[in-house]
Amino acid sequence: MATLKIKKGDTVQIITGKDRGLKGKVIRAYPEQNKVLVEGANRITRHTRVQQGTRGSQSGGIITQEAPIHVSNVMIVDPSDGKPTRIGYRINDDGTKVRVSRRTGTEL
């Protein structure tokens, strides 16, 4: 299984689906499922049952939250010009491996 090139905190753009064109920050990455959770994208509605809390508090009702999106449906946004780009890797002179933009060559 290949490693996930998109990390938590990256800004990505949705390239297909109902939220196409939307830009958002990656909240969480799920490498074992090849999915990412993007802030404000792929919102779903959950109906939760009322649960009795220990102190008499009740929580329940309709909740909207983000659902994971497959990494093939998002592209990372190049920080230099704000356009979506593919990701490559480069090894610096000191031996560290860094992610770079394929379009502009800038480090991500």
UniProtKB/Swiss-Prot annotation:
GO terms for molecular function: rRNA binding; structural constituent of ribosome. One of two assembly initiator proteins, it binds directly to the 5'-end of the 23S rRNA, where it nucleates assembly of the 50S subunit. One of the proteins that surrounds the polypeptide exit tunnel on the outside of the subunit. Part of the 50S ribosomal subunit. This is Large ribosomal subunit protein uL24. The keyword RNA-binding applies. NCBIfam families: rplX_bact. Keywords: Ribonucleoprotein, Ribosomal protein, RNA-binding, rRNA-binding. GO terms for biological process: translation. Pfam families: KOW, ribosomal_L24. It comes from Frankia casuarinae (strain DSM 45818 / CECT 9043 / HFP020203 / CcI3). InterPro entries: KOW (IPR005824), Rib_uL2_dom2 (IPR014722), Ribosomal_uL24 (IPR003256), Ribosomal_uL24_CS (IPR005825), Ribosomal_uL24_KOW (IPR041988), Translation_prot_SH3-like_sf (IPR008991). One of its GO terms (cellular component) is ribonucleoprotein complex. SMART domains: KOW. Belongs to the universal ribosomal protein uL24 family. PROSITE patterns: RIBOSOMAL_L24. Gene3D superfamilies: 2.30.30.30. The keyword Transferase does not apply.
